[in-house]
Amino acid sequence: MNVFINAEVYNDLISYSLRRLPEEACGFILGGQDSGNGELQTSTFIPLRNIASNPWNRFEISPVEMLPYLMDSNHPVIGLFHSHPTAPPLPSEQDLQTLWHSIPTYWILSLQQPQRPELQLYQIKKAPQTAYHKLAFVIGQ
């Protein structure tokens, strides 16, 4: 699976994450699938409030805040996004325990070096055991 990220979405998630430092930022990526080549294409980044009791090294999204996006079939959620303020863009043990494996992509932005953010996208599978693999992506106009 390949993902096309438009530049506005990419810039929005970086600027939001930098503003949220030192806490983890989180949100949804909306978009769809190109019927011609099967590539996922982003349309919008939706920042969501991190309500975790310890937002410096974990994230939690309010069910009330996320539900409208999950129920909107006209603008599907194709990605779950969060930042790692002080860690590389690799899924942590906590990330791998996610219940969000039904969302096609899992995005992690590392801000270890805030002047050089590093984004990685993954697909997480739960059965028969939890596994993840990197996804290819292109940042375009």
Stretches with model-predicted labels:
Residues L80:
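Conserved, mostly hydrophobic/aromatic
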